[in-house]
Amino acid sequence: MTLLSCITALTLSAVMIYSPLKLLSDVLLKQAEIEEDILLNQNMNRAMELLMRAIREAGYRSNQNSKNENDIQIKQGGLFRGSDAIELMQDLPKHLAYDCMGNILSKERTRHRKTYQHFYLERSRNDPRSAILICQSLDRQGRLHQAELLNQVQYLQIHWVNPHAVDINSMKPKVASGLIKISLGVERKSQAGKGNTLIEQVRLVAPRHI
């Protein structure tokens, strides 16, 4: 067998072996990305549910003399990539209820007889191109403490919307009544070097007591 024949045979063998290996590698990478997408969506769902629960209960009054005009405060922009923040307060409920960290709301966890929860973004220390969704609440001494709810966040947008609008994209900010629109974006980093993927969720929630 000539040298040229040997080189040709080796080349053909390499091509035949490389193609299945490349295909298998691509399949495994795609499977890993799908699994990460599922996990990110689950984590986003959990964070959204905690935020929506706090919004639904905000403004609760234990008696008619209690005021709740300022129990929902949305802060527009000024945070990571212009993201919004929301502060939520309510009188201590008579039924069993929890804050965003899973603590039972109690008299000790109030300030001026109101519970407090705050959702906002904080730039990640490990990856300055992304942020962490933070939840603040009150501990048993009525002091602020916080927990991280979600990583790899790109934006959080919150505003009052027109409850009569049909198309979500056409909804306009309004005064404190009706519905609140929450938009959350999380980035999944590509393992194949083909660019990152933005995963987005939008929810509408109606406060029950405002």
Report the location of each language-model feature.
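Short, flexible loop/turn elements at secondary-structure junctions
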Residues: I7-A9, L92, Q157-N162
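N-terminal single-pass transmembrane signal-anchor helix
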Residues: M1-V27, E36
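Exposed loop/turn and edge beta-strand positions of beta-sandwich/beta-sheet ligand-binding modules
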Residues: C6, G82, A176
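Extracytoplasmic beta-strand-rich oligomerization domains located immediately C-terminal to a leader/signal peptide
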Residues: P20-Q141
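Short linear sequence signals and composition-biased patches located at protein termini or domain-edge surfaces
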Residues: L39, G77-L79, R143-I210
